[in-house]
Amino acid sequence: MCMTDPIADMLTRIRNAQAAEKKEVKIPSSKLKKAILKILKDEGYIESYQEIVSDGKLSVDICLKYFNGGPVISSLTRISKPGLRRYSSRNNLPKVMHGLGIAIVSTSKGVMTERSARAGGVGGELLCIVA
């Protein structure tokens, strides 16, 4: 199966699993996905994740986080897509919900939140917004 946007697929799997109130979700592994998951874990949006090998293929098992019976992530939106890439300079990085959410940015210094990119003085490709 040819997948044109693996990041959007990962975000959709997380959204669907939370809508179905699943405890965990399994996705194919990649370095970029693991970098995004590390940010989600550090910011408190997911419980944990771990890389596993099943049938000779690497995948990531994500433990989702809930609070008061509802998912912690209320919105998970892909911004830059393969057909239309979205880039932002350090001065134009978005503030999500006035600082209550995060934007994940792929920069020359790695994948980071928009706050880290602004503090580091770098811009980059806006991957997704989490609130």
Curated annotation (Swiss-Prot):
Keyword Ribosomal protein: yes
Gene Ontology BP annotations: translation
InterPro entries the record matches: Ribosomal_uS8 (IPR000630), Ribosomal_uS8_CS (IPR047863), Ribosomal_uS8_sf (IPR035987)
One Pfam family matching this protein: Ribosomal_S8
Keyword entries, A-Z: Ribonucleoprotein, Ribosomal protein, RNA-binding, rRNA-binding
Origin: domain of life: Bacteria
An example Gene Ontology molecular-function term: structural constituent of ribosome
This protein's GO CC annotations: ribonucleoprotein complex; ribosome
NCBIfam families for this protein: PRK00136.1
Subunit structure: Part of the 30S ribosomal subunit. Contacts proteins S5 and S12.
Free-text function comment from the UniProt entry: One of the primary rRNA binding proteins, it binds directly to 16S rRNA central domain where it helps coordinate assembly of the platform of the 30S subunit.
PANTHER family: 40S RIBOSOMAL PROTEIN S15A
Name of the protein in its database record: Small ribosomal subunit protein uS8
